[in-house]
C-alpha cells in the first residue's frame, strides 16, 4: 500500500527530502537519511504497530537486549547529521540509533533495539530531537535558574558561585575547598548536570590545586580577582597536571598586561576564552583576536547575541550592577564604557557564522539570561541568513550546514571544551540520554519535553486537575525525573579525576552519578565540530573596526527578531 508524502509525514514524521522550518525563522532543515523507513514504521497507540506480538516482542525479558525507552521516528538535529531514526535507551544511556521493534517479525531492526514488555515509548514523530544543551558559563546565584534552563533545553551547567554574594554575582567562581564542598552538596538536589569551577588565582600552586582535589571540575580566571600573567600561568600549570579546563575573563583595563602579555602567559596551552567579543569583559579593545588562535576555544555569552538596536543600551546598566561599580565614580563609568563596542559586537555575529567563534553560553544572572542560550543561538543563525544569505556549502535550498554549525555551539563543542564529551553533548551510542524534544513551531524557544538520563524531567503539560494532559494552562513543569531519589540517577556531577580518586564523593556523601572530567589538555580549535576555523583577526585600536583576511566584518543591528514576542506574554 502507498500513501502520499503528506499522509506519511502526518503519521510518521518527515522522511528523506522533506524540509522542516525551525520556529518562525527563515531556517529550514532537510532530512538527510531515514533509518526507520520501510516494513511497518513503528508507532504507538490504539490500532498501531507497537502491540504485543506485532512491534512489541512479548517473549524477551529485559536482560535480552530489550530497551527501557524507545523514542520513535525522531528527527535528530545533531553535529553528526540531520536524520530520522528511532532512539533506544537502556540504563539511562543511548544504546541504539536506528530502527526499534520486534526482530522476530520485522526486517531491519537494529541490534540492541528490541521493543519488549519492559519498554516505555515516547512518540517523537513530528518532533525535532537534540542533545541537551551545555551552558559552560553560569553564575550559581539562584537555584531557580535550573528550571529556566531546562525550559530552554539546557541539561548541563558549568560555572561557579555560592549564591548572591558579590564574588558570585561578578565571577563564575566557587572559591576554595570549603565552598566547593558545600556547593557539591547543594547541587545534589538540582535536576541538572553540574560542574563547578574553582578560583584560578594564587601566588603558588597549592591554593589552586587544593580546589581541584576538593572536587572542582575546572578553573576560572577572572579580572575581578586579578587576571595577571602569573595567575594564568599557574592555573594552566595545574590544569595540565590535573587534566581540567581553564576558562578566562581577561584584564579589561590592561593593568597587568595587554593581550600580547596574556597570550605570552598562555604560551600555546589550550584555554577556554569566555565572551571573547569583550562586552562581557576582557582586554579592551582587541580581546576578540584570541578567537583566531589554534589553542583558544572561543565562546560567546548571550546578551550580545545577536546584534540588535537594543544591545548597546542595555549593556551599561547590566555591567555596572554585575561588577559592583558606581555611577558616581567616573573611573567606574569609564571602565564600563570601554567594554561596549558596537563594531566588535557586529563582527561577533559574522565570526559565529564563519565558524570562528565555536561556542555559546549564557553568563546567567551576570549579564546573561539562563533560559535563552538555545534561543539566541538560533536568532543569530537566522539574522546571518537574512543578512549574508545561504552559506556556500548549502544544498537543495536547505540550511543543514548552518544548522549543524549552530547546534554544535551549545552541545558537542562545550562538552569537548570542558572534558565531558564522553558522557554528554551529542546523540550517539554510549552517551547519557539527555535529550530534548521540540515541536518545530516552538523549536529553540520552549522545549516540549526534556529527558534526563532516560526519564522525562521537564515537560509542557496542562492542568494537573484535568481529565487529560492537554487542557490549558499548558506550561513547563517539573516531572517525575526530578522527584525523590530518582534525581540522583538522572543527573551527573562532573568532578576532577584527582578528587574522585581521593574519594571525595564518598566523603561528602554524594548520591548522584559522578562523571570524570578528562581529555581537556590535548585538544584545540581543530576539535571544535563545524566551528574549527583559525585566522588572523585584526581590531583597530582607535575605530574598533574588525578585519579578517583584510575584509572588514560588520553588519547592521536589527529591529525585529524571530523567536521573540510571538512566543511570550511577558
Swiss-Prot record:
InterPro entries: Amidohydro-rel (IPR006680), Metal-dep_hydrolase_composite (IPR011059), Metal_Hydrolase (IPR032466), Urease_alpha_N_dom (IPR011612), Urease_alpha_subunit (IPR050112), Urease_AS (IPR017950), Urease_asu (IPR005848), Urease_asu_c (IPR017951)
Active-site residues annotated for this sequence: 323
Intracellular or extracellular location(s): Cytoplasm
Cofactor binding description: Binds 2 nickel ions per subunit.
GO MF annotation terms: nickel cation binding; urease activity
Post-translational modification: Carboxylation allows a single lysine to coordinate two nickel ions.
Cofactor requirement: Ni cation
Keywords annotated in UniProt: Cytoplasm, Hydrolase, Metal-binding, Nickel
EC identifiers of the protein: 3.5.1.5
Domain of life of the source: Bacteria
Catalytic activity entry: urea + 2 H2O + H(+) = hydrogencarbonate + 2 NH4(+)
Sequence positions bearing N6-carboxylysine: 220
NCBIfam families per UniProt: PRK13207.1, urease_alph
Subunit description: Heterotrimer of UreA (gamma), UreB (beta) and UreC (alpha) subunits. Three heterotrimers associate to form the active enzyme.
Protein name: Urease subunit alpha
UniProt lineage: Bacteria, Bacillati, Bacillota, Bacilli, Bacillales
Gene: ureC
Amino acid at each position: 500500500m502507498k500513501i502520499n508524502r503528506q499522509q506519511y509525514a502526518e503519521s510518521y514524521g518527515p522522511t528523506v527530502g522533506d524540509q522542516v522550518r525551525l520556529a518562525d525563522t527563515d531556517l529550514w532543515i532537510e532530512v538527510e537519511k531515514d533509518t526507520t523507513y520501510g516494513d511497518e514504521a513503528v508507532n504507538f497507540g490504539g490500532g498501531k504497530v507497537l502491540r504485543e506480538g506485532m512491534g512489541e516482542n512479548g517473549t524477551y525479558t529485559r536482560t535480552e537486549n530489550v530497551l527501557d525507552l524507545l523514542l520513535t521516528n525522531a528527527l535528530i538535529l545533531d553535529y553528526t547529521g540531520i536524520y530520522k531514526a528511532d532512539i533506544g535507551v537502556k540504563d539511562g544511556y543511548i544504546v541504539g540509533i536506528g530502527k526499534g521493534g520486534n526482530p522476530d517479525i520485522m526486517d531491519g531492526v537494529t541490534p540492541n533495539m528490541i521493543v519488549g514488555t519492559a519498554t516505555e515509548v515516547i512518540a517523537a514523530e513530528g518532533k525535532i530531537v537534540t542533545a541537551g544543551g551545555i551552558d559552560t558559563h553560569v553564575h550559581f546565584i539562584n537555584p531557580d535558574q535550573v528550571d529556566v534552563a531546562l525550559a530552554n533545553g539546557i541539561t548541563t551547567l558549568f560555572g561557579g558561585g555560592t549564591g548572591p554574594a558579590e564574588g558570585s554575582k561578578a565571577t563564575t567562581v566557587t572559591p576554595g575547598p570549603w565552598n566547593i564542598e558545600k556547593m557539591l552538596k547543594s547541587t545534589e538536589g538540582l535536576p541538572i548536570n553540574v560542574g563547578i569551577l574553582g578560583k584560578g588565582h594564587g601566588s603558588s600552586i597549592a591554593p589552586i590545586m587544593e580546589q581541584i582535589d576538593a572536587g572542582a571540575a575546572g578553573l576560572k580566571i577572572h579580572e575581578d580577582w586579578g587576571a595577571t600573567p602569573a595567575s594564568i600561568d599557574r592555573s594552566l600549570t595545574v590544569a595540565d597536571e590535573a587534566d581540567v579546563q581553564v576558562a578566562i575573563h581577561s584584564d579589561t583595563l590592561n593593568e597587568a598586561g595587554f593581550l600580547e602579555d596574556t597570550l605570552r602567559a598562555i604560551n600555546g596551552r589550550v584555554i577556554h576564552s569566555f565572551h571573547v567579543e569583550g562586552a562581557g569583559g576582557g582586554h579592551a579593545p582587541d580581546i576578540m583576536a584570541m578567537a583566531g588562535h589554534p589553542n583558544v576555544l572561543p565562546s560567546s555569552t548571550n546578551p550580545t547575541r545577536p546584534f540588535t538596536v537594543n544591545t548597546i543600551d542595555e549593556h551599561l546598566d547590566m555591567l555596572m550592577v554585575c561588577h559592583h561599580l558606581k555611577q558616581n565614580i567616573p573611573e567606574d563609568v569609564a571602565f564600563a564604557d570601554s567594554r561596549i563596542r558596537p563594531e566588535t559586537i557586529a563582527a561577533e555575529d559574522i565570526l559565529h557564522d564563519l565558524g570562528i567563534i565555536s561556542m555559546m553560553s549564557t553568563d546567567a544572572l551576570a549579564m546573561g539570561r539562563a533560559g535563552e542560550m538555545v534561543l539566541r543561538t538560533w536568532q543569530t543563525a537566522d539574522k546571518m541568513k537574512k543578512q549574508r544569505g545561504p552559506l556556500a556549502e548549502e544544498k537543495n535550498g536547505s540550511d543543514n550546514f548552518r544548522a549543524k554549525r549552530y547546534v554544535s555551539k551549545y552541545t558537542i563543542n562545550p562538552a569537548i571544551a570542558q572534558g565531558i564529551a564522553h558522557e554528554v553533548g551529542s546523540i550517539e551510542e554510549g552517551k547519557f540520554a539527555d535529550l530534548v524534544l521540540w515541536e518545530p513551531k516552538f523549536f529553540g524557544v520552549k522545549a516540549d519535553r526534556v529527558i534526563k538520563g532516560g526519564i522525562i524531567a521537564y515537560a509542557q503539560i496542562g492542568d494537573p486537575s484535568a481529565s487529560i494532559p492537554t487542557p490549558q494552562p499548558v506550561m513547563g513543569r517539573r516531572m517525575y525525573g526530578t522527584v525523590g531519589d530518582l534525581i540522583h540517577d538522572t543527573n551527573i556531577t562532573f568532578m576532577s579525576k584527582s578528587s574522585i580518586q581521593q574519594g571525595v564523593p564518598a566523603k561528602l556523601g554524594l548520591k548522584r552519578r559522578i562523571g570524570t572530567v578528562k581529555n581537556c589538555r590535548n585538544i584545540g580549535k581543530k576539535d571544535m565540530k563545524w566551528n574549527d576555523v583559525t585566522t588572523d583577526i585584526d581590531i583597530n585600536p582607535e575605530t574598533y573596526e574588525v578585519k579578517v583576511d583584510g575584509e572588514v566584518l560588520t553588519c547592521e543591528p536589527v529591529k525585529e527578531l524571530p523567536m521573540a514576542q510571538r512566543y511570550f506574554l511577558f
